[in-house]
Amino acid sequence: MKVLVPVKRLIDYNVKARVKSDGSGVDLANVKMSMNPFDEIAVEEAIRLKEKGQAEEIIAVSIGVKQAAETLRTALAMGADRAILVVAADDVQQDIEPLAVAKILAAVARAEGTELIIAGKQAIDNDMNATGQMLAAILGWAQATFASKVEIEGAKAKVTREVDGGLQTIAVSLPAVVTADLRLNEPRYASLPNIMKAKKKPLDEKTAADYGVDVAPRLEVVSVREPEGRKAGIKVGSVDELVGKLKEAGVI
């Protein structure tokens, strides 16, 4: 079974993002970039399936700028077998929209004969949480989102999901799309020997045009702004003073 894992290059989650002065977006100049954390979890899960003998090959795919090759090398160092970089933008500020990403991934999955796609549930830069669902719809495959546990049983995948008030376990027929939640696993660190080996693993470069997909944006970002700072609180000396302050604020 071939497993396809999409990975996205974005601002490292330890870095505090800065909004551009004109409010047009996030400033990516001289900022450390890394793999989307949910995608790291997806890569790890694919590797674990291979270690169990349930996957034959893991293909990592990234869609965006050429610099995303670094992100793919990370996936290869973790344990992916080969990678495909689909160059769909020249400007690092351009974020390829979920629908275009889903269309490209669907084309890659068909070309590669993939039976399982494991993706992060969302990217932490835009929090769209849409690509996996769109991808399943385009392919006409079953989908299991927000997975906290994945088990392959013959021609089916049994997926446990966290829902309000408990856990839900569903079984989906393969081929399928699974999106990874935070509690699915703890991703491994790539060892130095594996980082060196990753440089020799295949990394093919394609373009969106190779798959016949138009990546022109359909959404317009009107403005981006940082969250408002939290106002300092005050200490009150008595219950009466607290009640008075609440009345002043119009709470009671």
UniProtKB/Swiss-Prot annotation:
The keyword Electron transport applies. Keywords: Electron transport, FAD, Flavoprotein, Transport. CDD domains: ETF_beta. The keyword Ligase does not apply. Disulfide bonds: none annotated. SMART domains: ETF (SM00893). GO terms for molecular function: electron transfer activity. Binds 1 FAD per dimer. It comes from the Bacteria. Its cofactor is FAD; AMP. InterPro entries: ET-Flavoprotein_bsu_CS, ETF_a/b_N, ETF_b, ETF_beta_N, Rossmann-like_a/b/a_fold. Heterodimer of an alpha and a beta subunit. The electron transfer flavoprotein serves as a specific electron acceptor for other dehydrogenases. It transfers the electrons to the main respiratory chain via ETF-ubiquinone oxidoreductase (ETF dehydrogenase). Belongs to the ETF beta-subunit/FixA family. This is Electron transfer flavoprotein subunit beta. It comes from Paracoccus denitrificans.
